[in-house]
């Protein structure tokens, strides 16, 4: 996974609104449920105070699509779920992926320790676990990519990629805002691929 695909800096001039939203969206994580999803707090993107913040996220999504030479004018960028993650010392995120979206992101607010690991099966591997015998880890023989988080760092990746955090000694909370994005076609109905705009959907 190329670093240019997953990492970018995004500075917020006024972080006070982000902290105010966190005060409203925080939850009790003492029982191990460290993500807002487990508490029904998944609509942070509806907080009007954070509209400028999410517009900046959208710009980063468009840049992400542009990196792959995707015709970005074809798609609407839909924020479908966003939540805070609160990790106390000794708490980590297990291996998981986001099954309900196309693109996922995490924005680090307070970040002591705990690297994020993106994991994907390497198509170069000739047989199961072949790359457990490597002498040196390189871009073409590995199946993981480690990102050391830092404040105001935005990480974006395909939702289908498994990821987790590795524990590191720390004394403070790690707080981040994560989200899921679904791409829908803007106007086109002449293609097999891609989701049609939601206005064409119907329930019976």
Where do the model's predicted regions map?
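Single conserved hydrophobic/aromatic residue that forms the stacking wall/gate
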Residues: 1-7, 11-12
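Short, cationic low-complexity segments
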Residues: 29, 129, 197-204
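Signature of the catalytic double-stranded beta-helix
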Residues: 33-91, 95-98
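Catalytic core of non-heme Fe(II) oxygenases with the double-stranded beta-helix
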Residues: 87-156, 173, 183-195
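Ligand-binding loop in jelly-roll beta-barrel domains
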Residues: 162, 166-176
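An acidic/histidine-cluster motif and surrounding catalytic segment
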Residues: 180
